[in-house]
């Protein structure tokens, strides 16, 4: 399964449209690879992990009204996040224009961000395809 990302934290956590996390859980349960495809500009090394990603909350009436008509009782509140966050443990890989980070973790993303590997190759716990 392929998906995009609006933001990727330094540890590989991915913020994307609501529903991405649920799809990743299902893919993991059914042993289907779950791959994020996004440009390197999406990776934010200053955001350490998924908990640090600020998730925008949309107006409640986006889900309590349809075409201007109420679909919930008056005064009903609604939790309406614009994104959800998928932890790196549910991802098979992150594909960027610089290569493929697999497994998804801070080490593989650092190697991709650096743009090159040393002559001996990446450390043993880091695997990056170019």
Where are these regions (language model features)?
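Conserved phosphate- and dinucleotide-binding cores of soluble alpha/beta proteins
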Residues: 1-130
């Amino acid at each position: 399964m392929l998906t995009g990302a609006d933001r990727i934290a330094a540890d590989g956590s991915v913020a994307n449209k609501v529903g991405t996390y649920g799809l990743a859980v299902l893919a993991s349960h059914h042993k289907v690879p779950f791959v994020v495809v996004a440009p390197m500009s999406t990776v934010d090394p200053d955001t350490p992990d998924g908990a640090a990603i600020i998730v925008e909350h949309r107006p409640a009436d986006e889900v309590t009204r349809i075409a201007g008509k109420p679909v919930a009782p008056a005064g009903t509140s609604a939790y309406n996040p614009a994104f959800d966050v998928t932890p790196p443990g549910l991802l098979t890989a992150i594909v960027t224009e610089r290569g493929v980070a697999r497994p998804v973790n801070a080490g593989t993303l650092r190697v991709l961000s650096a743009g090159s590997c040393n002559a001996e190759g990446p450390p043993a716990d880091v695997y990056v395809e170019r």
